[in-house]
Amino acid sequence: MFNIVLVEPEIPPNTGNVIRLAANTGCRLHLVEPLGFSMDDKHMRRAGLDYHEYAQVLRHASWQALLDSQRPPAGRLFAMTTHGAGSVYDMRFLPGDWLVFGAETRGLAPDVRESFPMAQRLRVPMQPGQRSLNLSNTVAVTVFEAWRQNGFAGSHHPAAADQG
């Protein structure tokens, strides 16, 4: 469905939650190193429960390694950032899109963030004066909005059945 990219995630339970989300939504998860934890971390595994076997998780040595090996279409890469100009609710997502999220404590590195055209830097609306949402919550909000726009294709949702 969609490609979720976590660039240098730091907190094991957040990644575990995203693994579970990927399994339940049919997304592929890309983890860009360095990771702030071991993939065997008990907190990450607990958050992902037994969903690891149902999620497609790929690891990449760096942001450039992901770009070189996966070759995502430049026009379908979206950076989720508090520095975003547009809202995830204003973007029209397509199956196969790449949804890119930065580290919990610092977001995307400036060089990665600045490599995205301003129109592809998106944010989730928040109340004024708030810094950011939790990473796994932001991923969930974004993925479900993208999936909703595509009729929850592949799910048991009635909208998905209407498309068949």
Curated annotation (Swiss-Prot):
Major enzyme class: transferase
In terms of InterPro entries, this protein maps to: Alpha/beta_knot_MTases (IPR029028), SpoU_MeTrfase (IPR001537), TrmL (IPR016914), tRNA_m1G_MTases_N (IPR029026)
> Which GO cellular component term is one of those annotated?
cytoplasm
CDD domains tied to this protein: SpoU-like_TrmL (cd18094)
- Taxonomically, the superkingdom here is Bacteria
Any idea which GO molecular function terms this record carries?
Answer: RNA binding; tRNA (5-carboxymethylaminomethyluridine(34)-2'-O)-methyltransferase activity; tRNA (cytidine(34)-2'-O)-methyltransferase activity
User: What task does this protein carry out?
Assistant: Methylates the ribose at the nucleotide 34 wobble position in the two leucyl isoacceptors tRNA(Leu)(CmAA) and tRNA(Leu)(cmnm5UmAA). Catalyzes the methyl transfer from S-adenosyl-L-methionine to the 2'-OH of the wobble nucleotide.
Per the record, the similarity remark reads: Belongs to the class IV-like SAM-binding methyltransferase superfamily. RNA methyltransferase TrmH family. TrmL subfamily.
Q: How does it assemble?
A: Homodimer.
What protein name applies here? tRNA (cytidine(34)-2'-O)-methyltransferase
